[in-house]
A protein has these predicted regions:
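Iron-sulfur-associated redox domains of electron-transfer enzymes in respiratory
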Residues: 1-246
């Protein structure tokens, strides 16, 4: 939720106060459009995220209402308590763990990753292919296990993409603060196709929303929509047999 950050940014820039603005590609593009082509952006620095898509706020609020009754003290969407690859949704209430489930077992995360309730516009995003005027782009380096397995400790590794001269200035100013090494464009894209392609809607997206509008819970709706088909079960069984024979 950008709230009034566009207006605040504009006011800061008028007073020559440096601003570092981070957000999704569409939020960065929106900021530039709001400021206008003639604005003085010399003190504006922007960082975009490699974006999978933006989930529906309604579904998130409903999920919390259905599953969390106590006051929430902290939420971590990508906790590494079980490792980087099997990141975990960790919700704490009053300082104690209330929900701690991996991305493959938590229904909210499953529904998001399978594109059941990303915003409609995300399926035809106009801000792929590095087109937002961002100075830096950051994300997870999901190609790490494939290209640099010797560096993979399952604690995660980030990508930093330098997009322009201003971004290079930022990178040069901070690069001595952390371990880094260069990789190729192909290595970036291999594990991060979201840089180039929009996420396709799940085939049961309409069914999911129909169930939600009929009063079904998020957990129930996700479970029903992502239930394996007969052929998927057959395929999974064959794969297990092949692994067992090896």
């Amino acid at each position: 939720n950008i709230k009034d950050t566009y207006r605040q940014t504009k006011e800061f820039l008028k007073r020559n106060i440096p601003v570092l603005y981070t957000g999704t590609p569409c939020q960065i593009a929106g900021l530039h459009k709001y400021l206008g082509k003639n604005a003085n952006k010399s003190q504006l620095f922007t960082v975009e995220l490699c974006c999978h898509g933006v989930p529906s706020p309604r579904i998130w609020k409903q999920y919390l209402k259905e599953n969390v009754t106590d006051d929430i003290s902290n939420i971590t969407f990508r906790s590494k308590i079980n490792g980087w690859k099997n990141y975990t949704l960790d919700i704490q209430t009053n300082g104690h763990t209330h929900i701690c489930e991996g991305k493959l077992s938590n229904n909210y995360m499953r529904g998001f990753l399978m594109n059941l309730y990303c915003r409609p516009i995300c399926s035809s995003c106009k801000f792929r292919e590095f087109s937002t005027e961002s100075d830096l782009s950051i994300g997870d380096f999901w190609g790490l296990p494939k290209f640099y397995p010797q560096k993979d400790d399952d604690k995660g590794m980030s990508l930093i993409l330098v997009m322009n001269e201003k971004g290079n200035m930022l990178f040069q100013a901070i690069k001595d603060e952390f371990y880094h090494f260069p990789i190729s464009y192909a290595e970036v894209i291999n594990g991060n196709t979201n840089y180039l392609h929009s996420v396709p809607f799940h085939t049961k997206r309409e069914l999911f929303w129909r169930m939600i509008n009929e009063g079904k819970s998020v957990n129930h709706s996700v479970s029903q929509c992502l239930k394996p088909t007969f052929f998927q079960n057959i395929k999974s069984t064959i794969k297990r047999i092949i692994r067992w024979k090896k």
